[in-house]
Amino acid sequence: MSTVLPEDSVGLVTPQTARFDEPLALACGRSLASYELVYETYGSLNASASNAVLICHALSGHHHAAGYHATTDRKPGWWDSCIGPGKPIDTNRFFVVSLNNLGGCNGSTGPSSVNPATGKPYGADFPVLTVEDWVHSQARLADRLGIRQWAAIVGGSLGGMQALQWTMTYPDRVRHCVDIASAPKLSAQNIAFNEVARQAILTDPEFHGGSFQDQGVIPKRGLMLARMVGHITYLSDDSMGEKFGRELKSDKLNYDFHSVEFQVESYLRYQGEEFSGRFDANTYLLMTKALDYFDPAAANGGDLAATLAHVTADYCIMSFTTDWRFSPARSREIVDALMAARKNVCYLEIDSPYGHDAFLIPTPRYMQGFANYMNRIAI
């Protein structure tokens, strides 16, 4: 059934594909001879190309950040609450670019793509990627679109790490960095969660060493468990308690190990089932490794202020009080380093019950603070 699109929507959008035939050297020592990036754009690029904003996605994100692909779509893009006319990233002012990162599974070249050298899917042979690899590939997309400098680069979670990396790798190509619910590197606990998720996939009998496509199967159980573990870390204890508590699906206990008895069990299984049907297992492994490897200050003995000494962008750092995956303390590490390096930075810590997922949820103070900063950006 067709729906009437909201007035503050960017409307119907069509994904585009950019192909690059110049080899891309990667941090792992390998290279990709050619690759494709799928992206969407919203709004119009002005004559001086000074109003461009790049959206960097998180672990399971993709290029479809706003609008609709068809009037029959049940939901808009994943960040539609923040991108559109009159929204924080106002498409009446900005030309917005959102892409599916290299290694993804939504159209950009990744493990599920055909390796031209073999005629088969890359699978586990796809090279391991880093955040800086993504930034280099994104810079090539900017060149292709005629964008010399971004007015702003915006991202939440892993997307925020990409935004931060941009300001270090290409300091003269970024005027503003909006880094939301992120961190300067993962804690040991976060790496541990990622490893549990990876082991769920790697030990699934249907994984076949990453060559499951050749076998005509998917490691559904492993992906499901990985998503269930990950999803717990995206929510706060308060929000889970309020949403589910100890409510049962029926009015009695079954006294077995197979029934789905609690509402929270049902929710996690649904999330896992849905995710396992749309996401690639090898991509999940790649994304979590890129998270683990992100540590830009390592080259300076862990001194983040020294690492940021050469940056020229202005920064807006936002965090959420109940986010325990990337707590406010992690955002303040970035803020403190920027201040020590004498850079321009503003910081907003937002009261929210929604945990790490709060960066996706349009609460009033978040939207107001986000919009206030974006409206200050000269174009």
UniProtKB/Swiss-Prot annotation:
It is an enzyme of class 2 (transferase). One of its GO terms (molecular function) is homoserine O-acetyltransferase activity. Pathway: Amino-acid biosynthesis; L-methionine biosynthesis via de novo pathway; O-succinyl-L-homoserine from L-homoserine: step 1/1. It catalyses: L-homoserine + succinyl-CoA = O-succinyl-L-homoserine + CoA. The keyword Glycosyltransferase does not apply. Its EC number is 2.3.1.46. It holds the Pfam family Abhydrolase_1. It is found in: Cytoplasm. The record marks 325 as: Important for acyl-CoA specificity. InterPro entries: AB_hydrolase_1, AB_hydrolase_fold, HAT_MetX-like. Substrate binds at residues 227, 357. One of its GO terms (biological process) is homoserine metabolic process. Keywords: Acyltransferase, Amino-acid biosynthesis, Cytoplasm, Methionine biosynthesis, Transferase. Belongs to the AB hydrolase superfamily. MetX family. Transfers a succinyl group from succinyl-CoA to L-homoserine, forming succinyl-L-homoserine. This is Homoserine O-succinyltransferase. The gene is metXS.
